[in-house]
Curated annotation (Swiss-Prot):
Chain residues that bind substrate: N123, T173, K177, R295, H327, S379
Class of the enzyme per the UniProt entry, highest EC level: lyase
Modification N-acetylproline occurs at: P3
Necessary cofactors: Mg(2+)
Record's protein name: Ribulose bisphosphate carboxylase large chain
Coiled-coil annotated residue ranges, if any: none
Site feature location: Transition state stabilizer: K334
Length: 498
């Protein structure tokens, strides 16, 4: 390591300002297994060298400030400082760089996503020397991961609780999201569950408003759950949104849900905050409740390509903080989400170990050391014609959630639920028989529609509904090139040998 990167205790204090790169840019640094690693997309102001910009990020998100201070001599900056250890130019983007920063583990409180984010993204995003800054990815080391409980239960425990295997789970968000009375709301829940869905859901902004107070909603939804269970012989659930203005009120609602005996509750983890979410996840683990997570407000943070926090980071944070489900986009619906990027963070939610794969936006390998997985929830502008693609993209360990695609059925809520259940069962059966859902999906649905009038009616209503808009957040050209090279190699190895 070059001498200028080291803090020498023997050197007397010299007041003044010096370049960040003299202390915080360390290209010879070898990362440790215990380091938290971050990949930042940095857009410096004109005239600011990329090394200085990367070093400024490392400094301002760890031990540094704008000037030298006397108290630097009272500690070991070499032990505690963040280090920018690599910078690479983003091909195809003007003045954008990926700056890699390593943080010593001792900088962070154990088991606290709140402290992790306060340090890494808390202040540096307003730094004047940067035009824009985005946190693209984090590597959470096993030593830090082990300080978190993570999801209350995880995928396998949820399947065992529900006694549902071998297929994605089906859900529906009750619409209109605001304005229904508690009794009419409960009626819609019952009709959807009775028609064949596994779950129904409160929308993210359903809390406790004048038209429907939370306690009334909980009671009528519990009645709908028990009635539909008795009639179908299946375990059912409704995501009762416990999000509230205070943690005390949130936990009071969770307690009431537990007393009703329902299987699952819900939280808006970004608007509610990581501290509240972690507290609720601990309560759910201790009291046998599943926890559904909505990501309301995420696009404010993650949608712009050059500034903010990528959703893969927010997904990792949720797995640490705790949740059994989280909304992940659909690829095919009305909400933002490129296929390869979405599949990348879906793997980060579910798998125990994920390899580095820049073609899917994954900058670092991630070892979750047996932390339970989280089910991705595909929701937003989807209907029966999307079922083959959703089944292929997300696989069995997912929740496919049709709001308007259930409640918008021309014959009513229950027939809408029937249509979705029949479509899912047909796609799963076809997949298990070895059929190609991508190529034969429409034919599979048409065949199933011949013996299900509910599905046939749904197919007719939504046959021309598409959301053909290009995503804003896409892979960089150099990452796409890696994907293209991998596809070319695969064609050479496994292509048609006829």
């Amino acid at each position: 390591m070059s001498p200028q990167t080291e803090t020498k205790a023997s050197v007397g204090f010299k007041a003044g300002v010096k370049d960040y790169k003299l202390t915080y840019y360390t290209p010879d640094y070898e990362t440790k297994d215990t380091d938290i690693l971050a990949a930042f997309r940095v857009t410096p102001q004109p005239g600011v060298p990329p090394e200085e910009a990367g070093a400024a990020v490392a400094a301002e998100s760890s031990t540094g400030t704008w000037t030298t201070v006397w108290t630097d001599g009272l500690t070991s900056l070499d032990r505690y400082k963040g280090r920018c250890y690599r910078i690479e130019r983003v091909i195809g983007e003007k003045d954008q760089y990926i700056a890699y920063v390593a943080y010593p583990l001792d900088l962070f409180e154990e088991g606290s996503v709140t402290n992790l984010f306060t340090s890494i993204v808390g202040n540096v995003f307003g730094f004047k020397a940067l035009r824009a800054l985005r946190l693209e990815d984090l590597r959470i080391p096993p030593a830090y991961t082990k300080t978190f409980q993570g999801p209350p239960h995880g995928i396998q425990v949820e399947r065992d609780k529900l006694n549902k295997y071998g297929r994605p789970l089906l859900g529906c968000t009750i619409k209109p999201k605001l304005g229904l009375s508690a009794k009419n709301y409960g009626r819609a829940v019952y009709e959807c569950l009775r028609g064949g869905l596994d779950f129904t859901k409160d929308d993210e902004n359903v809390n406790s408003q004048p038209f429907m107070r939370w306690r009334d909603r909980f009671l009528f939804c519990a009645e709908a759950i028990y009635k539909s269970q008795a009639e179908t012989g299946e375990i059912k659930g409704h995501y009762l949104n416990a999000t509230a203005g205070t943690c005390e009120e949130m936990l009071k609602r969770a307690l009431f849900a537990r007393e009703l005996g329902v299987p699952i509750i819900m939280h808006d983890y970004l608007t509610g905050g990581f501290t509240a979410n972690t507290s609720l996840a601990h309560y759910c683990r201790e009291n046998g409740l599943l926890l559904h997570i909505h990501r309301a407000m995420h696009a404010v943070i993650d949608r712009q390509k050059n500034h903010g926090i990528h959703f893969r980071v927010l997904a990792k944070a949720l797995r640490l903080s705790g949740g059994d489900h989280i909304h992940s986009g659909t690829v095919v619906g009305k909400l933002e989400g490129e296929r390869e990027i979405t599949l990348g963070f879906v793997d980060l939610l579910r798998d125990d170990f994920v390899e580095q794969d820049r073609s899917r936006g994954i900058y670092f390998p991630q070892d979750w050391v047996s932390l339970p997985g989280v089910m991705p929830v595909a929701s937003g502008g989807i209907h029966v014609w999307h079922m083959p693609a959703l089944t292929e993209i997300f696989g069995d360990d997912s929740v496919l959630q049709f709001g308007g695609g259930t409640l918008g059925h021309p014959w009513g809520n229950a027939p809408g639920a029937v249509a979705n259940r029949v479509a899912l069962e047909a796609c799963v059966q076809a997949r298990n028989e070895g059929r190609d859902l991508a190529q034969e999906g429409n034919d599979i649905l048409r065949q199933a529609g011949k013996w299900s009038p509910e599905l046939a009616a749904a197919c007719e209503v939504w046959k021309e509904i598409r959301f053909d808009f290009k995503p804003v957040d896409t892979l960089d050209p150099n990452d796409k090139k890696q994907r293209d090279n991998e596809d070319t190699l695969a064609d050479k190895l496994f292509g048609d040998k006829g």
